[in-house]
Amino acid sequence: MTHSALRAFLTKGLASTLLLLAGCTEVTPSFVADARPQRLSEWNLFDLNTQRLQPLPVVEVVKPTNPLFTDYAHKLRTLWMPEGTQARLVNDEIDYPVGTVLSKTFYYPVDDAGNVIRVANQGAREINLADSRLIETRVLVRQEAGWDALPYVWNEEETEAFLRVAGASRPLTMVTAASPETPATQFAYFVPNENQCSGCHTTEHPDGGMHPLGAIASQLTASSHSASGEFQPQIETLVARGWLDRAPQGPALDSYEDTSLPIGQRALAYLNMQCGHCHNPDGAADTSGLVLTGRHKTAVSMGVCKPPVAAGGGAGDLQYGIVPGDPDSSILHYRVASAKPDEMMPELGRSLVHEEGVALIREWIGTLTGSCDEQSDSRIAGESGFEPSVAKKTTG
């Protein structure tokens, strides 16, 4: 029996039951207070049948302007708040109410042989199970005491995802849609454990609480199709639904994928989302003295002509974080281009190198001028995207 046939057989009864229930009552998501459901289905976020995984109509699909890279996985992100609750905008950040449930489902398109396909994510609002493989769904829920992170791993039949607080791994083989002649890549996809979830979602160490990284005000300024079909900024969708009291003021966030922008702005936007949650003055990587949020005060704090202080062997025997005009001599480029566990950055969330991201950082460093032999921070700071005044707060 094929993978799809087995899934169809196992979910036929479930689909029939859901149809019967739909005729009797409207299915709505559930907020489970101070508990950890073992099955993803207990949250009632999705309609799952033999053809697709689709968020319920009352659940909003969201997409951050600058997504995190996770081994070229596609992601379906959702947001839901209990009826009668509303988030507040406080200092341009969203303060979500107790009961808010965020989810992010990681999946890949697959070919007939079961290989996962490296292809651009088109931002689908549902997942077609006939040509996709579900890997994991991460749930971030706002409890009374703060945010709680729950990793759920999908079974092989794609009928249910189960809580795995210790994480998991999945061996995968990836082919590239744009170049079929490229040899397939075998790698291990790692589902983070509970502590690793906390490590990234806690941007103020050691005593700060977890919070979202993508579903924040600055990352939701991009336009998207809402559940009602309207194409508008996602923040305005939340306000229209009554889920947010007001929209933040100011321009939309730069996207690192927007090739019409100057290379410096794109590079800062990329580093902010991929690295800024740790590399900020209060983050887990504060001992490095490296600020990659885009809110650096000097070029040196961004890494220009800055010697490493906490990189260990991960520096690749290089002298400076960024050497203007020379990416091959820059530790920043070296670490994002590495896939070795003791060298790569980010150190969690990937097994593969984000080739497009590395190319962006390489091009940007190549445009920088100046010399580390004659470093002048005031001279370098205003060049090629280092101007602190143009930086925006883009991570929580």
Where do the protein language model's features map onto the residues?
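Histidine-centered active-site/metal-ligand motif
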Residues: 3, 74-77, 201, 279
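N-terminal secretory signal peptides that target proteins for export/translocation
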Residues: 1-8
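Sequence context surrounding c-type heme c attachment/ligation sites in exported
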Residues: 24-32, 117-396
